[in-house]
Structure formats: structure tokens, C-alpha cells
């Protein structure tokens, strides 16, 4: 499991996982869009071999 800490978030958008088929097989992606307090936009893309690996737990 990988942990990503994001601080000073103004807006957080977590998309549902989507599957993609490539020449090497099926894989899953999930995008996270973050806008911080200074209006800086960051896009994070996660890749995995199965949908369960892309589970996200929000800690508040």
C-alpha cells in the first residue's frame, strides 16, 4: 500500500476507477485532482493491476 499525504487542500476530486486494455493486458487507473489554498492544480494518476488495489481511504 502506498500513502500520499496532501495538505492545505481547497478542492479534492477523486474519480472512480476505470479499466484500460493495452497490448500487455488489462490495467486500472484512477485520477485524483487537487487544488490547494494557493489555487495550484495537481493531477495524480494511480495505476494498478486490479480495481481493489485502487481503493482510497480518506483520513480527516
Which positions does each model-derived feature cover?
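N-terminal acidic leader/helix
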Residues: 1-29
Amino acid at each position: 500500500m502506498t500513502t500520499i499525504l496532501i495538505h492545505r487542500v481547497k478542492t479534492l476530486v477523486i474519480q472512480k476507477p476505470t479499466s484500460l486494455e493495452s497490448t500487455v493486458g488489462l490495467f486500472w487507473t484512477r485520477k485524483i485532482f487537487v487544488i490547494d489554498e494557493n489555487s495550484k492544480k495537481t493531477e495524480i494518476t494511480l495505476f494498478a493491476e486490479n480495481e481493489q488495489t485502487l481503493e482510497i481511504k480518506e483520513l480527516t
